[in-house]
Amino acid sequence: MKKSTKLLAGIVTLASAMTLAACQSTNDNTSVITMKGDTISVSDFYNETKNTEVSQRAMLNLVVSRVFEDQYGKKVSKKKTEEAYNKSAEQYGASFSAALAQSGLTTDTYKRQIRSAMLVEYAVKEAAKKELTDADYKKAYESYTPEMTTQVITLDNEETAKAILGEVKAEGADFAAIAKEKTTAADKKVDYKFDSGDTKLPADVIKAASGLKEGDISEVVSVLDPATYQNKFYIVKVTKKAEKASDWKKYKKRLKEIVLAEKTQNIDFQNKVIAKALDKANVKIKDQAFANILAQYANTDKKASKANTSKSDQKTSSDSSKDSQSSKSKSEK
């Protein structure tokens, strides 16, 4: 079952991290396995496995988990962790236990993984809030489309979708009636309201609707369903479209949500926040086998510094060019 293998990206590594932690908290000479003429100690096992990719990732996850629990643990309640766990369990239904087992997890290790992710998410969101500027709002406003009322046909087959597109675009066609009859959406829903920053439908579908005028019908929009790895096909009609106000401040609250969502999903920004937390925790690696596990975060500030330097150089170059042109103009006079 494909669904059970996608529990969480990298989730199995936390279970491995727990194994490493257990090794470190036990006497190095403690026997893990005994046999005739030999034994395998905790130290033997640790040295054999510490250089593997799984162990490297596991140690990184363990470090990040401990650091964020220390710095942000009070900001995310255990109740919220339980709620997130229960929601995930409900989504998987009867296959949840199998998904855990296939990923090498127990209920406790999965909850720890969820909590670690929630702590990082909290830290990233708070950092994003502090960096919000009017320029961010204005940029988001430029591509923002206010609420649209739409009718959406969801289909599983491209040829069928093309045929139905012809039907709904025919003169006098009743789009709503055809949509209700033909859609293959599980809940048979065809009526939607959303703005350009919404996530209730695939991004490409919302983008297509945003580009339509009131009364227009889109072409067939093909979207890969991440749950099934199969393409879904959509046809959208915009039945009502709110006029966009000229002042971005009218949408400030909504634009804030959109900007924060974009920032928190940005990998470079996430790494920057994690790097700052690791630096604050003064993480020191004692075993050289794990010397490079934080490398991706060590370069974060350098990238930011390089980007800022580049912008500064461009500004200096531009200013110098303007000064040169000004001097030339005065000389000619």
UniProtKB/Swiss-Prot annotation:
One Gene Ontology term of the molecular function aspect: peptidyl-prolyl cis-trans isomerase activity
Pfam families membership: Rotamase_2
Domain PpiC: 145-240
Recorded topology in the membrane: Lipid-anchor
Signal peptide: 1-22
Keywords of this entry: Cell membrane, Isomerase, Lipoprotein, Membrane, Palmitate, Rotamase, Signal
Chemical reaction(s) catalysed: [protein]-peptidylproline (omega=180) = [protein]-peptidylproline (omega=0)
GO biological process: protein folding
Main localization of the protein described in the UniProt heading: membrane
Biased composition (Low complexity): 323-333
Sites of S-diacylglycerol cysteine lipidation: 23
Biased composition (Basic and acidic residues): 312-322
Stretches for region Disordered: 301-333
Lipid attachment residues per UniProt (N-palmitoyl cysteine): 23
InterPro entries, per the entry: Foldase_PrsA (IPR023059), PPIase_dom_sf (IPR046357), PPIase_PpiC (IPR000297), PrsA_foldase (IPR050245), Trigger_fact/SurA_dom_sf (IPR027304)
Gene Ontology CC terms, in alphabetical order: plasma membrane
EC number(s) from the headed UniProt entry: 5.2.1.8
Localization per Swiss-Prot or TrEMBL: Cell membrane
Assigned protein family: Belongs to the PrsA family.
Alphabetized PANTHER family for the sequence: FOLDASE PROTEIN PRSA, PEPTIDYLPROLYL ISOMERASE
Function statement: Plays a major role in protein secretion by helping the post-translocational extracellular folding of several secreted proteins.
Descriptive protein name: Foldase protein PrsA
Organism: Streptococcus equi subsp. zooepidemicus (strain H70)
Gene from which the chain derives: prsA
